[in-house]
Amino acid sequence: MYLVAGDRGLAGCGHLLVSLLGLLLLLARSGTRALVCLPCDESKCEEPRNCPGSIVQGVCGCCYTCASQRNESCGGTFGIYGTCDRGLRCVIRPPLNGDSLTEYEAGVCEDENWTDDQLLGFKPCNENLIAGCNIINGKCECNTIRTCSNPFEFPSQDMCLSALKRIEEEKPDCSKARCEVQFSPRCPEDSVLIEGYAPPGECCPLPSRCVCNPAGCLRKVCQPGNLNILVSKASGKPGECCDLYECKPVFGVDCRTVECPPVQQTACPPDSYETQVRLTADGCCTLPTRCECLSGLCGFPVCEVGSTPRIVSRGDGTPGKCCDVFECVNDTKPACVFNNVEYYDGDMFRMDNCRFCRCQGGVAICFTAQCGEINCERYYVPEGECCPVCEDPVYPFNNPAGCYANGLILAHGDRWREDDCTFCQCVNGERHCVATVCGQTCTNPVKVPGECCPVCEEPTIITVDPPACGELSNCTLTGKDCINGFKRDHNGCRTCQCINTEELCSERKQGCTLNCPFGFLTDAQNCEICECRPRPKKCRPIICDKYCPLGLLKNKHGCDICRCKKCPELSCSKICPLGFQQDSHGCLICKCREASASAGPPILSGTCLTVDGHHHKNEESWHDGCRECYCLNGREMCALITCPVPACGNPTIHPGQCCPSCADDFVVQKPELSTPSICHAPGGEYFVEGETWNIDSCTQCTCHSGRVLCETEVCPPLLCQNPSRTQDSCCPQCTDQPFRPSLSRNNSVPNYCKNDEGDIFLAAESWKPDVCTSCICIDSVISCFSESCPSVSCERPVLRKGQCCPYCIEDTIPKKVVCHFSGKAYADEERWDLDSCTHCYCLQGQTLCSTVSCPPLPCVEPINVEGSCCPMCPEMYVPEPTNIPIEKTNHRGEVDLEVPLWPTPSENDIVHLPRDMGHLQVDYRDNRLHPSEDSSLDSIASVVVPIIICLSIIIAFLFINQKKQWIPLLCWYRTPTKPSSLNNQLVSVDCKKGTRVQVDSSQRMLRIAEPDARFSGFYSMQKQNHLQADNFYQTV
């Protein structure tokens, strides 16, 4: 029994020992799967050196190690054998005996052979140790970090300290600055907070912002048999800074459980081939194949004699259209017909002065000549030419000798063409020649025989994506150091090198064909330009004792004469089609003459705060992503862009876009800049560098670097659904009852709102999150209203910065036209005189002139009066009133000052008549004659003499005006106290009709007479500014 009992006890102990041994083995096995990591101490980490690729974190996520390269080991438990570099994958092959994969096998790094859709533009990032410094809170903070891109502004501490010293010297006075309170946003895990700081030269800090932190992007560590697959690409915005990966199994999947999608058989065209079959990531299914063009297939056909190849369709390099398709046709060339003249294939002909055509396959392909910019005050377009040329100022005709050119003798003022590009003018016996200025807007201009300026056979508007130029880092040069600008690389980006004078001037004379015996003229930068220097003047020394502050006058040869200048020399580079304005002394000033200038808003000064919330210094230029902008005296001036009007009722401007679009409209509308010119305003006017004007009552524009930049009024938020804009308002207004907020008295509700970006708004505060939306904070809830855009009738509506809806600028700008006559430009409705007999008028671009015809005179010996067109009889001539002393020389050669007998009367002046008119003394007051109180005339003389004089005057006028209407004497009885006159000529009024005034001239001019309520039977003279007022169409 005991034995049995003892056997049973031993058996129980044996079972217990076996159980304990199995538990220990299980713990031992499980211990091999555990990963024990000590607390991270980066000071004990060794920096990996000479890594052939990038670096990755170790298994414990503390220290860095070199990433495994192609054909190196990887995988294992927790990736203990290594992690493959970017662009490689860890491939673990199944065992040869058919067993399933475990997590202990080691893999090999191989290339990733995924499709483009699976990779999503996956690119490796080579992280390196980068050292540098940044200015933070007025101090230089330096550090050394491992990153992909350089986050430092200065590469060394010395450069940072020198920049900090320069900033301290230019630091503004911030004692009175008022800065807005900036709230710091809460950043996602993949980004870091950049605290707002005050830029150099500014007092207020910029808002704090979140920026992506590449070091915070971690890739998942997948178990063996799985691979990191890129699912979505990072967008660069906080919250989307990192690429998103998922772990997917690799070749360890049982394909029997995988259902593959059907793959259609690809049939490729004859000009292409089918690519090889590829497998999916799990190795179970095949991917669709695609067609690619065959290499070396395209060629030029060889046609038989008598036929030539002609292209049928152009190839674009895609399967089915890999090559151009030709056909052989007969040699009979189709012709182009223009003005009943046939032109064959390849022939060029001229449609008008500026358009040339080439006949191609029976179709006329026309192009426009390319004219360049001219920098002169006076210019003209030669007859039969397109591009203007500069013209010398008009000199008085002093030399009767002409110019000898091309075997002909030409007179003063004559112009002729020397060659294709040179035009000359005869000025006082000397030939002055200038060259045509040509422009170039295409890469391959074509020279037309017999023409100066080339033409572009490709479209004249070339759309080129601007190069993505980064900031000019590690460069201590400033704009003051490089007065001629910075050099640019092949991508058009600035480099840290200045343009010297030789490089700047080399382009000024490029293509110049003038042969100038006395050299070339120079511009403001002392660079030679394509214009000849005139013959040097040989002047004799003069002796002049006059003191002339403004210098002496010059004769036609450019030599000084002993006469003083009354006006200073005009040094101005502006191009003014209407000429320059004059000051009170009649001297020209550097300001263009305008027909009418509307008063604009006052010009501010200082820095600009843009609509986007950025600060810019005065005269600073920048590009806001959509348009070119410029800071002018505190105003943000931006170029107008052309945008289509959205069709929906609640448009918005999406991030990264420039034009308003609808929510479901995914087509990015690229804005077009308004047609660039040499500051050619939308209204048709020309402006020069630095000039400002108003295109309407709401928009002020300026000319900067050859582009029209405009600023507009910033509009407040609109708290209604359907705002509208009237012609007399600059901003849209709420036509219906606007939303009026009422403050809540519920203390349990917070008195602020918070949007999705973390911005905080107070109760009843309104704002515009974008230019098309207005919001308001009520009871901690944000309510928003969208603006809808009305339809427009123009082809190219423009969009001002800061506004939502495009509009037609043609509706607000009156079209102004200019008349060109004798080399001068005149504004619309402007008048001028060619001489005393010919008067001209500009009407809508047409020049209309009228000539006065002189009537026969009853006298035998008429006289010519200076300033008058027609001669007149001596008894009709009455000298005009004057009180200017006249110089007369007596018989001894002395100069006497003599005042005329008819002084200009002023108030309370007494006029003494000559002796031959009797002893009549009158007092001139209130513009009327009054008998003097101390007159000694007797009663008979005071009555008879005036009657005789009046009857003589009346008989003389009735005889002269016998063809005119008789003047009823009763009409003169109602003449007002102020006499009516026109151009110092006698005015006769028809009292019965009251609407026509006849001037004593052979060409009678019609005037409109309107009743004046102050005087009974009197009509005031109202000058009308149109052709019917001056009778340019007919004479009576």
Swiss-Prot record:
One of its GO terms (molecular function) is PDZ domain binding. Residues 35-939 are extracellular. Residues 961-1036 are cytoplasmic. SUPFAM superfamilies: FnI-like domain, Growth factor receptor domain, Leech antihemostatic proteins. Glycans are attached at N71, N113, N330, N474, N746. The chain crosses the membrane at residues 940-960. The modification Phosphothreonine is found at T1035. One of its GO terms (cellular component) is membrane. It is a single-pass type I membrane protein. Residues 1-34 form the signal peptide. GO terms for biological process: negative regulation of BMP signaling pathway; negative regulation of osteoblast differentiation; nervous system development. Residues 35-112 form the IGFBP N-terminal domain. InterPro entries: Antistasin-like (IPR004094), CRIM1 (IPR052624), CRIM1_C (IPR045813), Growth_fac_rcpt_cys_sf (IPR009030), Hirudin/antistatin (IPR011061), IGFBP-like (IPR000867), VWF_dom (IPR001007). Expressed in pancreas, kidney, skeletal muscle, lung, placenta, brain, heart, spleen, liver and small intestine. Expressed in blood vessels (at protein level). Residues 334-391, 401-457, 606-663, 677-735, 751-809, 817-874 form the VWFC domain. Interacts with BMP4 and BMP7. This is Cysteine-rich motor neuron 1 protein. It comes from Homo sapiens (Human).
